[in-house]
């Protein structure tokens, strides 16, 4: 018979000051498959915790799982990440099936504690620092000191469900699912400090059968990303994202990165607010993205100052200056209020069969627009801004791509 485990029985204090790592880990280790470790009625401050299959970690509405603001309280979990190096996490699982995180409570990660806020914020080469106003400076990237690199990290797990949680202030990628199968996120809110770099909402790498629904992601970096960064030889596929709200200083929705292979994805009924980019589909040498569709996306883009990728585009579909390939992209029945046109950019036709149908565009420049008007941002494929190529209609820039179809409709009044 499954049982409910109270970490206080293992010595947890839950006063928000005492470090409860050891007591929480004892409670988690004591849980048999089917058991629930329930955090209730307090703030449980902790460093790194290891999870295992068959476990439910329930954080009740009156409870907070608080990540320690001291990096010394975290440890390497034993996974080498190809981009971030050794993985240092708040919660992690390496292998294990039937894992659930839930409960209606809050995970507070204390991300700002790992940043240097006195650092002169990064200013891109295109901008004269003397012209930067205080309002613009507050949009720029802060500096990293030393941080947990993958706050919630699951690798090689199956049948994972995360639902009814609020996660605050991640210092880096909030959720990472690497080499996982059958993952569902439902009614999850992630709210991160927008000046912290790399604080993605949820990042799926080399995973399959993914469902993300009814979630809110407010992030400094990508809200939702699907790549193969942790395992370039694999495929990330069979993805549905629906009924979500997103805001990002980078891309709200990203498919592909460098040599990643991503396929078979649907995004629908998503609202994007004041993001550097809305939709981002990228492939570089050895990478490919195919058969992805976006339906009923309502988006507002805004150019944010600093080193953020993107310059107010409603979408960027890009395999420029590479041997990567992108095909079968459909963007349908979407409304875009943006600062720059959309971009479809390839080399010698390696981007093809892109359909933009029944979409409306309205371009309204913001305060940073004069720095970047008329230039494409193809980062990370191409490091420098490029002059705009010819336009398909007034609202889409196309270069080096084949079979790009555009059918606009007037914006809604």
Regions found by a protein language model. Give the residues of each.
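Extracellular/periplasmic carbohydrate-active domains that bind, remodel
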Residues: 1-413
């Amino acid at each position: 018979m499954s049982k409910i485990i109270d970490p206080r029985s293992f010595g947890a204090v839950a006063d928000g000051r005492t470090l409860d790592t050891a007591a929480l880990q004892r409670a988690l280790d004591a849980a048999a498959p089917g058991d629930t470790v329930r955090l209730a009625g307090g703030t449980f401050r902790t460093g790194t915790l290891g999870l295992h299959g068959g476990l439910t970690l329930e954080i009740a509405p009156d409870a907070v799982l608080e990540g320690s603001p001291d990096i010394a309280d975290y440890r390497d979990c034993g996974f080498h990440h190809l981009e971030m190096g050794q993985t240092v996490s708040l919660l992690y699982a390496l292998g294990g099936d039937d894992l659930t995180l839930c409960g209606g409570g809050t995970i507070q990660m204390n991300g700002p504690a790992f940043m240097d806020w006195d650092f002169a914020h990064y200013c891109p080469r295109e901008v004269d620092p003397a012209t930067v106003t205080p309002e613009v400076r507050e949009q720029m990237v802060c500096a990293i000191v030393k941080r947990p690199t993958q706050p919630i990290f699951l690798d090689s797990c199956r049948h994972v469900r995360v639902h009814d949680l609020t996660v605050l202030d991640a210092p880096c990628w909030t959720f990472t699912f690497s080499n996982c199968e059958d993952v569902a996120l439902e009614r999850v809110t992630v709210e991160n400090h927008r000046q912290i770099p790399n604080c993605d909402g949820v990042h799926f790498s080399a995973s399959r059968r993914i469902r993300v629904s009814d979630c809110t992601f407010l992030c400094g970096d990508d809200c939702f990303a699907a790549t193969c960064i942790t395992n370039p030889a694999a495929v990330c596929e069979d993805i549905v994202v629906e009924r979500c709200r997103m805001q990002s200083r980078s891309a709200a929705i990203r498919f592909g990165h460098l040599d990643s292979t991503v396929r078979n994805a649907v995004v629908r009924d998503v609202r994007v607010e004041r993001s550097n980019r809305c939709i981002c589909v990228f492939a570089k040498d050895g990478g490919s993205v195919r058969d992805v569709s976006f339906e009923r996306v309502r988006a507002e883009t805004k150019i944010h100052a600093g080193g953020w990728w993107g310059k107010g585009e409603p979408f960027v579909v890009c395999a420029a200056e590479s041997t990567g390939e992108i095909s079968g992209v459909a963007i349908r029945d979407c409304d875009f209020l943006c600062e720059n046109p959309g971009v479809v950019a390839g080399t010698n036709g390696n981007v093809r069969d892109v359909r933009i149908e029944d979409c409306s565009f309205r371009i309204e420049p913001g305060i940073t627009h004069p720095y970047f008007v008329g230039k494409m941002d193809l980062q990370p494929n191409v490091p420098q801004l490029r002059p705009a190529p010819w336009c398909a209609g007034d609202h889409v820039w196309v270069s080096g791509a084949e079979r790009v179809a555009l059918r606009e409709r007037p914006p809604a009044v």
